[in-house]
């Protein structure tokens, strides 16, 4: 069993035999249910890209304070290492293992101050979770679904900078995933997308998928 806890915006904590924090933007996150001082850290911190709302600086602080490894595209991982954190750089390619957690970085359509933006598939205790990072929809999501068969997808739906509900509905179809937790919505006024709209678009497409809309601090057991 893997517990998936939503920490607001695009931040998630995966808990099983290991702890994984993804895009751990805590300080300054208006949706965060915790303060960084309350965070226990993790074995692995995955940072999908270098924008201020995705937690590179918080990942570095937590790694230095509690241990664990910052995992990201090579250039971001090097920045984390330069600032004193344990880090492991990678690129889009294949599964690698870090501190008992399997990770593969995946394509994402976005921008990044350092390196290229990515998503990630995380394998923990026999379960696979796909965090898309910040991205628009792209047809290669079908490859991600076929290769890695995620049990759960964490998808942005806010629009403007990322997919909106319409685009996310196509992403779900391409991935072939049956369980989805929406993210990256309603944090700021421009991120207007809502889970209800995603459900409507899925209905129009005839796609059956469980949309699990978590409030910050709530968890889902996979």
UniProtKB/Swiss-Prot annotation:
One GO MF term attached to the UniProt entry: hydrolase activity
A Pfam family that the UniProt record links to this protein: Lactamase_B_2
Lineage: Archaea, Thermoproteota, Candidatus Korarchaeia, Candidatus Korarchaeales, Candidatus Korarchaeaceae
Keyword Hydrolase: yes
Family in the record: Belongs to the UPF0173 family.
Name by which UniProt lists this protein: UPF0173 metal-dependent hydrolase Kcr_0055
Keywords tagged on the record: Hydrolase
């Amino acid at each position: 069993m893997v517990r998936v806890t939503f920490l607001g915006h695009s931040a998630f904590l995966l808990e099983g035999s290991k702890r994984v924090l993804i895009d751990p933007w805590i300080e300054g996150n208006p949706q965060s249910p915790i303060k960084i001082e309350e965070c226990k850290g993790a074995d692995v911190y995955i940072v999908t890209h270098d924008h201020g709302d995705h937690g590179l600086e918080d990942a570095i602080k937590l790694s230095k304070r509690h241990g664990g490894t910052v995992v990201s595209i090579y250039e971001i991982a090097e920045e984390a290492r330069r600032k004193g954190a344990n880090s492991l750089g990678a690129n889009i390619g294949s599964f690698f293992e870090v501190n008992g957690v399997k990770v593969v970085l995946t394509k994402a359509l976005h921008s990044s101050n350092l390196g290229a933006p990515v998503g990630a598939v995380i394998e923990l205790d026999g379960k696979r979770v796909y965090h898309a990072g910040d991205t628009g929809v792209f047809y290669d999501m079908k490859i991600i679904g076929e290769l890695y068969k995620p049990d759960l997808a964490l998808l942005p739906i806010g629009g403007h900078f990322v997919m909106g509900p319409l685009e996310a509905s196509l992403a779900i179809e391409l991935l072939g995933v049956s369980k989805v937790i929406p993210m990256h919505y309603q944090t700021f006024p421009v991120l207007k997308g809502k889970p209800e709209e995603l459900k409507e678009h899925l209905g129009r497409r005839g796609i059956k998928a469980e949309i699990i809309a978590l409030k910050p601090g709530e968890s889902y057991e996979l």
